[in-house]
Amino acid sequence: MLSTTDDLRIQEIKELNTPEEVMREIPRTLTATRVVMTARNAIKSILSGTDDRLLVIVGPCSVHDPVAAVDYAERLAGLRERLADRLEIVMRVYFEKPRTTVGWKGLINDPDLDGSFNINKGLRLARNVLSAVNNLGLPAGTEFLDLTTPQYIADLVAWAAIGARTTESQIHRELASGLSCPVGFKNGTDGNVRIAADAVKSASHPHHFMAVTKGGRSAIAATTGNADCHIILRGGSRPNYDRASVDSAAAELARSGVAQRIMIDASHANSGKKPENQPQVVTDIARQISGGEQRIMGVMVESNLVAGRQDVLPGTALTYGQSITDGCVDWDTTVQALNRLADAVAARREVQCRKFRERSA
């Protein structure tokens, strides 16, 4: 008798509810559909340069408490409306966390924060949160880590990110080529911008790859390519949000034949992983924009109701509205940062008007 050679390290396999089942239970509303489509079109226009507003992806590092996430969304929806003439605000709603080694992998993977890994529950919670956010009139952005999760929630996502650890991955470039929304690729963890530029170029082309259907069957996906992709500067061995770094990144994009459209992440290596440094990063970015910088089309900010972060400890209640992954700035600091960016966009418009008048004189 032949020895078993397969699944030797698989302890258990459970059935996963199909995307079709979850989407039927939590259908997308007409309001959510309008919000998603309007935001996607706005972001596309910002990327093409026909909309001079700034795209701002702002919200918690990760969602662990759906109630607090919707509370945050209600506040952000009002701010989005007030600053809509200068900023296209999209809430950061991240459910999956790539880990350098090990740790909590996000609401979808372990929604109860206890190692029970009730992924079927996590998928429903994620879809419910996205539905609630969109129904407030607030578009949502998230990071995708695999080829399966998008089938459950991508119809409620206006913008997606591919993280620094996965930008160089062929699978993720293929995924981006088939997503219906604009996608941002972060530079590598070491600061390498070339891999992000290559990813944007790769994702713009058609691909064929193995995937999963809404009915849960294995399939072959054939994509058209995604022309609405861009890079995200998130720092590496050193920060890369300054003017010299923007110039360097733009030169790399030009060499790769990719549009010089750049988003800057105020967190991660650009803040030295210290959330209290995010405001000074935003201030520097705002200064560049105020001076007429056109290549910066977006900014990311990690923000929550309460500043800082906390650990999940058995028997200890969590602080409401505070991150359990990376530290964030609090709500008041967020409002100040977004007002600063909105003022910068207004100043950039003045610079452009002045240049136009000078050329016309």
Question: Where do the protein language model's features map onto the residues?
Answer:
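N- or domain-start disorder-to-order transition segments that initiate the globular core
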Residues: 9-50
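Conserved phosphate/anionic-ligand binding catalytic regions in large, soluble enzymes, centered on
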Residues: 55-68, 326
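Conserved, mostly hydrophobic/aromatic
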Residues: 59, 264, 330
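A contiguous, surface-oriented mixed alpha/beta subdomain in the mid-to-C-terminal portion of proteins
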Residues: 230-236, 240, 248-263
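Internal helix-turn-beta structural module
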Residues: 304-351
